[in-house]
């Protein structure tokens, strides 16, 4: 069953290199010509991904297995849209500030869609479009940012190991141990190493 879920990831999670345009952050920002990345290439940066059944998350055995194997004991939901989030425009701009966390950021899109932008090894931005059913894990120490897309709506399950800690450290915070560990594990790694994107 897990293989079927894994094989359909590209339908709910897509990644591409971004252009340098200053246009609205909610636009796709494709390069011309478009330059897509595989989810396995994303995994080389530590970004893991799954496709799950968002309509049945309460009883989904695959989600339960992932939570148990990775120790995700706490869960809540975050809805990002003008109607549900106070100070919506201010919040959306703050989410788009480049930052890192000292813990993994786990997000499972159960409705809507949004963009998670991550830096590659050469500091280029990769845009990761997560739609309903897509779950991603951003490793501790990776510089990233988030924005809704032009639909202005995402409902995401947030998962944590233990008590929820969501402290953003805006760039630069290269001195943090989580950043140094990220660089050692994913930036300085042997280019020949292969990492499974749904590990």
Curated annotation (Swiss-Prot):
Question: Which enzyme class, named as a word?
Answer: oxidoreductase
- What is any one of the record's Gene Ontology cellular component terms? cytoplasm
Which Gene Ontology molecular-function terms are recorded?
A: acireductone dioxygenase (Ni2+-requiring) activity; acireductone dioxygenase [iron(II)-requiring] activity; iron ion binding; nickel cation binding
**Per the UniProt entry, what are the Gene Ontology biological process annotations, in alphabetical order?**
L-methionine salvage from methylthioadenosine
Q: Describe the reaction catalysed, as an equation.
A: 1,2-dihydroxy-5-(methylsulfanyl)pent-1-en-3-one + O2 = 4-methylsulfanyl-2-oxobutanoate + formate + 2 H(+); 1,2-dihydroxy-5-(methylsulfanyl)pent-1-en-3-one + O2 = 3-(methylsulfanyl)propanoate + CO + formate + 2 H(+)
Cofactor requirement? Fe(2+); Ni(2+)
Metabolic or biological pathway: Amino-acid biosynthesis; L-methionine biosynthesis via salvage pathway; L-methionine from S-methyl-5-thio-alpha-D-ribose 1-phosphate: step 5/6
Task: List, alphabetically, the CDD domains matched.
Answer: cupin_ARD (cd02232)
What family does the entry list?
A: Belongs to the acireductone dioxygenase (ARD) family.
Q: HAMAP family attached here?
A: Salvage_MtnD_euk
Output this protein's name. Answer: Acireductone dioxygenase 3
Q: Organism source for this protein? A: Arabidopsis thaliana (Mouse-ear cress)
Encoding gene per record:
ARD3
């Amino acid at each position: 069953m897990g293989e079927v879920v894994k094989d359909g990831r590209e339908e709910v999670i897509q990644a591409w290199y971004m252009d340098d345009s200053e246009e609205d952050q909610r636009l796709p920002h494709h390069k011309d010509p478009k330059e897509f990345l595989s989810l396995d290439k994303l995994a080389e940066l530590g970004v893991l991904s799954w496709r799950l059944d968002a309509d049945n998350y309460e009883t989904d055995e695959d989600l339960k297995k992932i939570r148990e194997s990775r120790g995700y004991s706490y869960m809540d939901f975050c809805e990002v849209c003008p109607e549900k989030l106070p100070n919506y425009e201010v919040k959306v701009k703050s989410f788009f500030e480049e930052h890192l966390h000292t813990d993994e950021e786990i997000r499972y899109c159960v409705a809507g869609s949004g963009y998670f932008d991550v830096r590659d090894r050469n500091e280029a931005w990769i845009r990761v479009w997560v739609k309903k059913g897509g779950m991603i894990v951003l490793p501790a120490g990776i510089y990233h940012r988030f924005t809704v897309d032009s639909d202005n709506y995402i409902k995401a399950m947030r998962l944590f190991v233990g008590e929820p800690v969501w402290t953003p450290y805006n760039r630069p915070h290269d001195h943090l141990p989580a950043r140094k560990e990220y660089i050692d594990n994913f930036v300085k790694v042997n280019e020949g190493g292969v990492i499974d994107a749904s590990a």
